[in-house]
Swiss-Prot record:
Annotated InterPro entries: Nucleotide-bd_a/b_plait_sf (IPR012677), Ribosomal_uL23-like (IPR013025), Ribosomal_uL23/eL15/eS24_sf (IPR012678)
A Gene Ontology BP annotation from the UniProt entry: translation
Full protein name: Large ribosomal subunit protein uL23
Gene assigned in the entry: rplW
Function: One of the early assembly proteins it binds 23S rRNA. One of the proteins that surrounds the polypeptide exit tunnel on the outside of the ribosome. Forms the main docking site for trigger factor binding to the ribosome.
Protein keywords: Ribonucleoprotein, Ribosomal protein, RNA-binding, rRNA-binding
Length: 106
C-alpha cells in the first residue's frame, strides 16, 4: 500500500486540546488528533511519524457522532469527527508548540 506524502500531510487536521488529552499526554504519552473521516490507522501512524519525526507505538481511533442542534426553528446537525489517539514509543516525546513553530518557519 503506497502512501503518497501529499495525502499524509492532509490526514491530520488538528491536535485536540482538552482536559482529557492533556492527562493522556502526561500519563500515557498519548497524543490526540482530529483526522480525516476516511483515514486508516496505518496512514495516521505514517503521517505522525512523517510530520513530527517520532516513533509511534499504536493508534486507536474513535468516530464521534455530530450533535443535533437547533437554529431557531430549523434542526441542524454538526459534522461527525474522527479522533486518533496516538501512543508514542517509549522514550519518544512530541512537543506540539515546538512542532508548530518549526512548521511556521518553513
Amino acid at each position: 500500500m503506497g502512501m503518497n506524502q501529499q495525502r499524509l500531510t492532509q490526514v491530520i487536521l488538528a491536535p485536540i486540546v482538552s482536559e482529557k488529552s492533556n492527562v493522556l499526554a502526561e500519563k500515557r504519552n498519548q497524543m490526540t488528533f482530529k483526522v480525516l473521516a476516511n483515514a486508516a490507522k496505518p496512514e495516521i501512524k505514517a503521517a505522525v511519524e512523517l510530520l513530527f519525526g517520532v516513533q509511534v507505538a499504536s493508534v486507536t481511533t474513535v468516530t464521534t457522532k455530530g450533535k443535533t442542534k437547533r437554529f431557531g426553528r430549523t434542526l441542524g446537525r454538526r459534522s461527525d469527527v474522527k479522533k486518533a489517539y496516538v501512543s508514542l514509543a517509549a522514550g519518544q516525546e512530541l512537543d506540539l508548540e515546538a512542532a508548530a513553530a518549526a512548521a511556521d518557519k518553513e
